[in-house]
Structures are given as C-alpha cells and as structure tokens.
Amino acid sequence: MKIIKTADYNEMSKVAANIIAAQITLKPNSVLGLATGSSPIGTYKELISKYENGEIDFSDITTVNLDEYKGMPRTNEQSYYYFMNDNLFDHVNIDKNRTHVPNGMAEDAELECKEYEKLVKSVGGVDLQLLGLGRNGHIGFNEPSEEFAKETHCVDLTESTIEANKRFFASADDVPRQAFSMGIGTIMAAKKIVVVVSGADKAEAVKKAFTGPVTPNVPGSILQFHGDVTVVCDAEAYAELEK
C-alpha cells in the first residue's frame, strides 16, 4: 500500500486524476470502478479538464459504479446515476451504454445484486477502482459489521452514514435507509485501487483503516491485503499518521 500526502484537496484530486489518466492511456478500453460523494468530485473535474485538453479519450472506457440508494429514481438529483452524469459522463466522450450504476428502483433487490455482480464479471472485472473512505471506515456502502460482505448486496445504512449524507438532502429524514453496494470481495478483485481522502474528520478513519488491524468493523482496513493500492490524502486527512 502506498500512501501519498498532498497539500490540499486540489492537489489530492490532481494526483488521483493523473493515476486514472495513466490507466486510460495505457489501456484505452479499461473498466473503471467509480465512486460518488464529495471526495472524488475534484478528481472528476481534473479528468474532464484532461479530456478537454485532448490528453485522454473515454470512447472505449467502460464504468461500473460502487453503489446506489435503494428506492431512488435515476431522475432524482441525489441518485448516484444522476451524480455521475452531472459530474463526469455528460462532459466527456463516454458511451453512456457502457456506464453502469445499480438500479435503485429494482423491484427484486436480491436479483439486482446478482445481476450487477454478473455484469461486473461480464465486462472483464475492474482494472482500476476509485474509492472514498467514510468517517466510520466504510468503502462503498460496506458498513462496519461482523463480517466482510463478499458480493454486491443490499445494505442498511448506519446512523453515522445517514448523518454524513444528510447535507445532500433537505433533512436526515429524506436520506434513504438502504443502498445497493458492491461487496468487499468485488472491490478487492479490482486490479488496481485508488483511494481519495480529504478533511480532518477523516483523519482517524485513515489511521484505523490503513495502519490498524484488518477487521470488518473498519471495512476499509481490508485494503491492506490488496497488492496495488494507492491512498491519496490531503494534509488534514493524513494528520493522524504523523503522530
């Protein structure tokens, strides 16, 4: 595991975007695993800039997203489908038919999980997976629990995750209580993983996940067992590692 300390959010975003741009350049038909939330927005802005400057080409890229709120229609601005279009897909030359996000409105949750897992395998698996890290150490919507969930599954969101996500909604009551998420096994099957983490409120999670014991109570800690992980932190998120 390689942990890179950067000065601030902007530098963190640039470093992460450079790693992804290199992947696209070296393998133009890469499968990218993508994340949502505030952490990767800057990375996506940098990728859009690189595309506009003619540095990278998304025309042969396939994407699979980590997660989606259960019961959230794709037209809702808080859906991760909407987020991805708004923050990346609408601004680059990607084929929308090759962008995949779990269907939050699927009537059969169990079937949707199985189908999404099949989809990830059918595109050849993930070449590079972009992740954020939750305050409670979650990756995707894999919350702290008794065991690591292996495959795509439907998960109950913890109070801390609902609290963290309520800033995107009118109130905490509007935050969905469940989500579809790639499992830890699905994430770990990616050939390369890049984690972006920023802010002082993530510093404790960084320390626990990347220097503490590997435990399902801190889902991100499993990344210590992956052979090719780069964690890109801003100075605030890195702070606990310097103590």
Residue ranges of predicted features:
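N-terminal active-site beta-alpha-beta segment that forms phosphate/nucleotide-binding
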Residues: 2-115, 119-122
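Conserved phosphate- and dinucleotide-binding cores of soluble alpha/beta proteins
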Residues: 4, 72-78, 82-86, 90-243
